[in-house]
A protein has these predicted regions:
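N-terminal non-catalytic cap/leader segment that marks the start of a structured domain
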Residues: 30-118, 211, 219, 225, ...
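N-terminal accessory regions of nucleic-acid-interacting proteins
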Residues: 159-173
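Structural signature of FAD isoalloxazine-binding scaffolds in flavoprotein oxidoreductases
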Residues: 113-131, 146, 276-281
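Residue-level recognition of short, solvent-exposed, well-ordered loop/turn junctions
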Residues: 130, 145-147, 253, 270-271
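N-terminal amphipathic/hydrophobic targeting modules at extreme N-termini
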Residues: 2-4
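A structural-propensity feature for long, helix-poor, extended segments
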Residues: 131-151
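Catalytic-pocket segment enriched in acidic/His residues
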Residues: 79-80, 90, 106, 182-293
């Protein structure tokens, strides 16, 4: 068992996390960020924090007692090597709230008008898969597209949250691939079937806490070829606007994810493909595309 004195931090403009292990807790009192991971070891799912090539596991979940800046995370005293665990979806979302046409470039490539208010839809929790899991294309599929996106992970229950308080409700950020069947989307006139198939919501590889979401570079690669590239500064509706808007419609629960929309460059995937969503300061979400057996 490895119990480090201090986790490596990266600087941020805000007062965020202290990683010193004091009485089995990590206290959020200094600048820096924290990488939270969910993983499987010996048939059990656990949450932990990453330090180098090791994971220090948590007692319970990162949502337990989360109250925004100033919260702490309780450790259970165990440490594991990254190589010996399997990474899981980084949280258990009750729902994923997706955004359509939230990049000007994507609205232009699809020949839709810029929306006056956020265009939202729901992806079910049964669509969620984790890093290195398989995206399974349905038997009848005609065109299934990748959509690389920034995901916002809610840290606590949010209802009618004003924009200037929205940051206090965010646990962190992750990568999302909003997989979509284009013909079903066109035929139905609404998006539930097109975006709701099992495995159509890859998320991961972990949750990066307290980074600034307003100028992150997001890229999508298909078979190592760059297909999408943009900055979150180009979002039509920013992260805190979205939290305020969505929480005024529905209650967001701890672990829920807001998928903030995809930039231009969407395109089809086929069995045998490998798709990667990369966001600087977060990491890479990789998945393998297969046909339904």
């Amino acid at each position: 068992m490895i119990v480090p004195h201090r986790l490596k931090t990266t600087t941020s403009r805000n007062v965020i996390w202290d990683y010193s292990y004091k009485h089995d807790k990590i206290n959020r009192t200094e600048e820096g960020d924290l990488r939270i991971v969910r993983f499987a070891i010996q048939g059990k799912a656990k949450y932990g924090v990453i330090q180098g090539d090791n994971i220090s596991s948590l007692r319970g979940t990162p949502f337990t007692g989360f109250a925004g800046p100033g919260s702490s995370l309780a450790l259970d005293g165990n440490s594991y090597q990254l190589a010996e665990v399997r990474l899981l979806p980084p949280c258990l979302a009750s729902k994923i709230v997706g955004l359509g046409l939230n990049y000007r470039s994507h609205a232009e490539e699809t020949k839709f008008s810029i929306p006056a208010v956020p265009l939202i839809f729901i992806k079910p929790s049964t669509a969620v898969i984790g890093p290195d899991d398989e995206i399974v294309l349905p038997r009848f599929f005609r065109r299934v597209d990748y959509e690389g996106e920034l995901g916002v992970v809610m840290g606590k229950k949010a209802k009618n949250v004003p924009k200037d308080r929205a940051r206090d409700y965010v646990l962190g950020y992750t990568c999302v691939n909003d997989v979509s069947e284009r013909y079903a989307q066109k035929e139905d006139g609404q998006w539930t079937r097109a975006k709701g198939f099992d495995t159509f919501a890859p998320i991961g590889p972990w949750i990066e806490t307290e980074i600034e979401p307003d100028n992150l570079k997001i890229e999508t690669y298909l078979n190592k070829e760059l297909r999408q590239s943009a900055y979150t500064a180009d979002l039509i509706f920013g992260v805190y606007d979205l939290i305020s808007f969505i929480s005024g419609i529905m209650t967001l629960l701890p672990g829920d994810i807001i998928a903030t929309g995809t930039p231009s460059g969407i395109g089809p995937m086929n069995p045998g493909d490998v798709v990667e969503v990369r966001i600087n300061k977060i990491g890479t979400l990789r998945n393998f595309v297969v046909g339904q057996k």
